[in-house]
Amino acid sequence: MIGSPSALPALVDLLGDADREIAQAAQESLASIPGTKVDAAIMAMLADGTTDRRITAMDLIVRRRMITAIPALIDTAGGTDAKLRTVAVNKLGELAGPAELPRLLDLLAKAQGSEDLEATEQALSAICLKAEKPDSSVGLVEARLAQAQPAQKCALLRVLGSIGGANALRAVRGAVSDPNAEVHATAIRVMGGWNTADAAPDLLELARTATSPTDKMICLRGYLALAGHGDLPTDQRLTMCRQAAPLALKDDEKKLLLAALGGIASV
């Protein structure tokens, strides 16, 4: 029967069938058949197959929730094939947990291009958010900032932004003063996209002291976006708008202020 372990060799062969429907049906069967023999066959595909076959193996690893395959995925993510690296990192984002965070941070440090960086950043964010307390990941991520190259540092800042919380906010706020222009700009953007009100005082101060019109606009927009949060008390939202009013000098800035005020029911 096609759904039994005895069909395993035939199903593995059919994965490479020229008919896509047949190949897909074989993959669906392999995803559902229980047992360690199927797991072993999938691991063999990952270790010694064509690029397409290895990608299929990684798909099956995630679908079968093969946690024991995480070390092999990490090895693949650090390999020489760019396509396999990206797929492996994406699958780690789906399958790995907080325990693998240090290894993913190592992969980020060695990322060889924009695709590797983006994939690893997304996987890191996904893994951190799986933690019972995502804030517990901040220390490990922040510890990599000091020695990271600018591109990696920017990715780490975005990961911290996805985690959120007071500790992550402090780390991102500190990076605003980084001498590297790219890192500074990323820190400003992450601050401007913060979605909890604990960032409001920093955003207001940054908007007041910004020497760049772009920085000011990003911080003012972020601050007024927080003022628009309906879960904040009306009085607090009004106070925030009043504090921002002296900064709204240009038409675009005034529009942001008016939009925030317009969302407050009592105004």
How would you name each of these model-derived features?
Residues 26, 57, 88, 120, ...:
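Conserved hydrophobic register position within alpha-solenoid helical repeats
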Residues 4-16, 35-47, 66-78, 86, ...:
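Amphipathic alpha-helical scaffolding segments comprising HEAT/armadillo-like alpha-solenoid repeats
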Residues 99, 115-118, 214-217:
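Nucleotide-sugar-dependent
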Residues 6-8, 19-28, 37, 52-55, ...:
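A generic tandem-repeat structural signature
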Residues 3, 30-34, 61, 65, ...:
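Alpha-solenoid repeat junctions
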Residues 18-19, 49-50, 80-81, 112-113, ...:
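Short inter-helical turns and helix N-cap capping residues of alpha-solenoid HEAT/ARM repeat scaffolds
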